[in-house]
Amino acid sequence: MTLSWFHKLVPSKIRTEASTKSTVPEGLWCKCPSCNAILYKSEVERNLEVCPKCSHHMRISARKRLHLFLDPGNRLEIGEGLAPLDPLKFKDSKKYKDRLQQAQKATGEKDALIVVAGQLLGLPVVAGAFNFEFMGGSMGSVVGERFVRGVNHSLEHGAPFVVFSASGGARMQESLLSLFQMAKTSAALGRLSKARIPFISVLTDPTMGGVSASFAMLGDINIAEPGALIGFAGPRVIEQTVREKLPEGFQRSEFLLEHGAVDMIVDRRDLRERIAALLALMTRDGRAVAPAAAKAPPAIGEGAGEADLARCLSALPMDDPEAE
């Protein structure tokens, strides 16, 4: 049945205007997953992917993280040519090889960790960041090798090492090869500690499994972003195992700070200055830090001891382990 009678009644001009597509481009707006506010995308980006309404810290890619953290220019990517293999020919519901190709196509990266040597407010550093969009930021052999090469670069140049973790844990598709990386990365940090080169671990949402059980909690200073999920097994798994209801906010960074599992919580917008100030104290090189960041950072939360930590670090003779 045709609608010719309708076309006779409705002028063509009206029909044309009604069918005209909207000229508003896509991607102008986004929704905060915490407060559900509809936000202007460019405003969120200017705010470093932090919700301007509720200060929820959204997840960001590894490259964007490093772009925001390091000074522009003079950057060297470490282990860029490394790519994962499939020696076990692993297959679950999908072949591991196919999962890798899918993740690489979606993210444009070869694996989940990017390590870059650069500067932070003029202070030489080596920084690594996980991309959670790449197979949940899982740690496989390439992630472990890039991490160790980053440590080696720090040892060679005497530069502090900073890592932003965002991972679901060890990569099951690499089986024992992925579990080896827990020991491999931890042993590398032992060499860094012996050389008295600072390692700062920044735990972002989420940091779980084999990553939290290895290098992520081995920082000389462990920093968490607000509201980050941090732990080994997920809260639902724990509740099913112990058959008890977990406390409110269990495994969130605020809960961990209250119970001494992390040293401080720092807003993403303050991370550059805060970490630079701490590294200046730990390396005795305050000249490398901008004047605004050279002073001891303020305390956070209710009675948190970050200012006390900064004063202790500045007063402690770094070569005298017996000093109090």
UniProtKB/Swiss-Prot annotation:
The keyword Metal-binding belongs to this UniProt entry's keyword annotation: yes
Chemical reaction(s) catalysed: N(6)-carboxybiotinyl-L-lysyl-[protein] + acetyl-CoA = N(6)-biotinyl-L-lysyl-[protein] + malonyl-CoA
Cofactor: binding details: Binds 1 zinc ion per subunit.
Keywords: ATP-binding, Cytoplasm, Fatty acid biosynthesis, Fatty acid metabolism, Lipid biosynthesis, Lipid metabolism, Metal-binding, Nucleotide-binding, Transferase, Zinc, Zinc-finger
Pathway: Lipid metabolism; malonyl-CoA biosynthesis; malonyl-CoA from acetyl-CoA: step 1/1
Entry keyword Nucleotide-binding: yes
Protein location: Cytoplasm
Cofactor: Zn(2+)
Binding site for Zn(2+): 32, 35, 51, 54
GO terms for MF: acetyl-CoA carboxylase activity; ATP binding; carboxyl- or carbamoyltransferase activity; zinc ion binding
Chain intervals annotated as zinc finger (C4-type): 32-54
Any Gene Ontology CC annotation: acetate CoA-transferase complex
Enzyme class: transferase
Primary role: Component of the acetyl coenzyme A carboxylase (ACC) complex. Biotin carboxylase (BC) catalyzes the carboxylation of biotin on its carrier protein (BCCP) and then the CO(2) group is transferred by the transcarboxylase to acetyl-CoA to form malonyl-CoA.
Family: Belongs to the AccD/PCCB family.
Name of protein: Acetyl-coenzyme A carboxylase carboxyl transferase subunit beta
Organism: Methylococcus capsulatus (strain ATCC 33009 / NCIMB 11132 / Bath)
Gene name of the record: accD
